[in-house]
Amino acid sequence: MTLNLNSSLAGLSLLSGTNSFSLFSGGTPAFETLAVRRAKAAFTTPDTTPPWKQAGQAGSLSSQVSAIRRLSSIVDAGPITSRKLPDDVSSAFTTYRALDRLRALAEAAVSGPTASVRETLQGVFAEGLQDLETFVASSPRDKLSLAFDQPSSTVRSVAIKPESTVGTIAGKGVAEARDAPLLKLSGTERFAITIKRGDASDTISVDLSGGPQPPTLDSISSSINDAIAAVPLRGPDGSVNLDENGNPVPRWLVRFLPDKSTGSWGFKIENPGLEEVSIDQVDAPDALMVVTGLTDPDSPASTQVMRISDPAGTAERSTLSQIAGLDRLATERAELNAPKYAPIEGVEKPSLERFATTSAQSVVTAADGSSFVVGTTAGDLDANRVAGSQDLFLTKLDSEGKVVWQRALGASGSASGAAVALGPDGHVVVAGTVEGSFDGANTDGDMLVARFDAEGAELSSTLIRAVGKDTANALAVSADGSIFVGGRGATGGGDAFIARLDADGSLRERRRIDSGGSDTVNALAIGSNGELLALTSEGGVGTLRRIDSASLVNDLGSIELGQVDARALAVASDGTIGIGGSASSAVDGNQVNATGGGRDGFVARVSADLTSSDVSYIATGADDRVDSITFMNGNIYAGGRTSGDLSGTRRGTSDGFVARIDAGTGAIADIQQFGLATRNTEPVRIAAATGGSTVLGALGLKRGRLDDTDSSLLTAQTSLRAGDQFAIKVNDGVARRIIIDADETLATLSEKVSRITGTKATITSPSGDDGRTLSIAAKSGHTIELIGGGEGRDALSKLGLPAARLVAPPPFDKSAPKVVPGGSYGLDLTHALEISTREGAALALGRVKSAISMTQTAYRSLYWDTGKASIVNGGAAGTGGASPRQLAQIANYQDALARISSLTAGFNSGGFF
């Protein structure tokens, strides 16, 4: 018998005594189907040895950490790129090495001996996350795409509030029924309603005493609407226009209607003519607006907004609102650490929001009852994302304490707010200090003056450049709009400094005051004759100076108060000057009452010509100080803090107080003390709200314009500044830059992005509960890369957009292989990960290890393996599988081969080799 030993079916069995078909247990063949061969052909990446399989000693953990800290960045692609690896492999290896360094830092923090060591490691870890995100977003690629968080084809910006509402204005709900008596109204109130369109306006009086009693929403609505309808429309000659029935045609179409759209009954103002509608109560008592901070050992400071209604009468204090910057990363951290459990019906989950330190430094109230608060926050306010360590903020509140809008300076380094004032043109002026990067310049600590319009759009910002670290403390605006800013300069060991700017913010003049010691300007004001008043500390001596506002070098007089800490300054309508502060000994001047023996708060009344002063003490014998003062209708009001008992028993570690002092005699009329157990009260800032104790809040309304006016500019609603930028790369093409303009809106920015992305992405502005967002969505088969604008000028972070690569898979092709090399993989990382605590480090370590595993998976996706073959053949990964027809063919081959093998068994047993 002749045997064909070259047969492809029998060859292996003749040589080895076995056959290849016996390797297929469970009917799984070890040969490549046509589908496998087609899919495998796409896997062309050259073989490489990944870092995690390379031989070498990593060294001890401490030596690894030391080496990492010496690196300029944890992302070090040099050794990898020098090997000329394929782009996908190079990116995967670089990402792995960076993650491995983050792992070492996290492991060291878990076992770190002290909190200070972990804090040091946290700085390196946070910077490493940032560097890794930047690298991953723009890493070289061919078939493999990595994402810092999760792969996505779409991103959305922070929400931008829509422009001011028009047509209909909804008030706050205040009653359960429209005809229910409004108990907070006496029925004798009088209102002035002003309706304006262009140059035309009318102020309409409404007296509730002539209507039904007690007042209800229905009765007040009728009174207001009847009064508005009684104003006739007149022709050019002054004659009254009549309708077809001979009745006068109303000039205005505004109507106040009871409405329940907010859940309870209030007012809805229908305004089909789009007029500007304002309201105020006539002859209402005065009020004080109070802003202060409360801190405790377990939480950062936030700003509380309060109002004292009728402070010369009933003096009713109420808390209206709070200003607190959101700590975005701490909030996300809390969400990461929160226990996971199913919702329980009727039980509300605790809030996971975490807040950053937010402190107010100054407040001013306008004639319409709105207030402006300036200060410093380390968190986000609405769509204003803090870009550096902290930022200056400006918040507008309506007469009821509701936030109308919030603004941040947008400094990429550090900025702090110091003072706020109103200009004669209605503009808002703020002063502060900026350190680090700002508007493309690096500052070492410079004073800044910024101007805003009534809608919160920035009009100008002026840095007062000087060598060394200067600090702004004070601000004043004169009747002609001239702006004065004061504080402490760095020269001479610390000199008092004053600068004058014109009404448009241009710097015109500087002056330094050097007593030979440590000097500073603590407060500024405009005197009754237009002169500049500067309250200074000169070598520890409190001094009030009168300075020529047209030429700062000319002193017009001065008065010394002694060794005091004088910080507050105000001017009465008759020219009397008020000074507030603290002192540990008697203040120079006529003594109205006795000192307390400790550090005492004081208020000094100084004559306009600086020839005399009278001093009143607010003292307990403990620690007392006055932070702010204001004049209003024959009284001086002082806001401050005490660690003693001024008007009742102290509640907190330190309490706040507001004192009323007779402006003529200096006698202390009354004091309100307030605080919370275990809490420390921050400086108390007050502002006079003349006529501010109205009943409008009881009607769900507010003083002034009833529609909230807010700028639609991105440079107003976000922390973006003109000149900030980012770039877009489409399908690995050339990066094209987008620069933010001063008048940028969501619409104009969307248009800029659309011009670059063209048909490769969908750009929309979807609307949500918080406003509209910028949405960028890569279209199928295309890649959109978002690139940050660089240090100090990055627009992406301020828009809430990541530096990322948006990848949209190509359309599904039924004829394409089931498995292709590469793909999109997410590292599932976040900047909320931190290693400053052992708990946080343990969580971060787990996430980094998962990211390492994902990077290894991404690398393996570039190479063919049996698992991929199984998927192509229709089985689950790693299980194999063949079609029934293929299995039947294999069974026949195995049967034939078995018979051949039995005939040739002797070749092997006989020592064929």
Task: Locate the predicted segments by residue.
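Extended alpha-helical or coil "stalk/linker/tether" regions that are enriched in polar/charged
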Residues: 681-716, 722-727, 734, 741-742, ...
